[in-house]
Amino acid sequence: MAGHSKWATTKHKKAVIDARRGKLFAKLIKNIEVAARTGGGDPDGNPTLYDAIQKAKKNSVPLDNIERARKRGAGEEAGGADWETIMYEGYAPGGVALLVECLTDNRNRAASEVRVAVTRNGGSMADAGSVSYLFNRKGLVVVPKEGTTEDDVTLAVLDAGAEDVNDVGEAFEVICEPSDLVAVRTALQEAGIEYESAELSFIPSVEVPLDEEGARKVMRLVDALEDSDDVQNVYTNADIPDEIMAKIS
């Protein structure tokens, strides 16, 4: 189980994380609130909530903020918005497929902000279903390389349902079916292997290779989308080589 996945914008996000820490905190808090509302406020009985809390902790969200979000979602504390998940589809420059996942309390505002960000940066919106078929819904666990090897990770997750382990530079990505995400994450924990995040994602079935100019255009559009408070995640099928990503980050 090897290979090299460049579809994610994870490394790019890390490069701009300091400038956007406030926005990142807000999005992580929103994830906790929605997970608690959907599956209950007990992380032990709600794997999605557990993973949302762990991700927030690893991104240094204050524990008090995390607990308040959990309580709001579970109905133990007043407040909290009526969040709605909406997926928008489109194309970035160069024919790169684009999935934009929003979590919003105002559908009209979200649609407007996504449309403006896409069209002002050389992209175009697409009808529902015309882009999403290029992606598969998968579980994704990111494991930092420090202190572990690809063989260590592979051995730990092989019997837990993992489909692939990819070396993506500073980390390994473990890909699995959504139903196997908890088993894969648990297998890593039992093997004593630290992981950075465990969540559902969209993995492209076909990638579009980009040169530096094309990569800059696509990442400019992604940045514009991620500036919106309503946008939770942006998925593309761009294939950007490491050396180009390092230049433009």
From Swiss-Prot:
One GO cellular component assignment for this chain's record is: cytosol
One Gene Ontology biological process:
regulation of DNA-templated transcription
> Where does the UniProt entry say this protein principally localizes?
cytoplasm
**Region forming the signal peptide:** none
Q: What GO terms are given for molecular function? A: DNA binding
Where is the protein found, in the record's own terms?
A: Cytoplasm
Its family remark reads: Belongs to the TACO1 family.
Protein known as? Probable transcriptional regulatory protein Tfu_2096
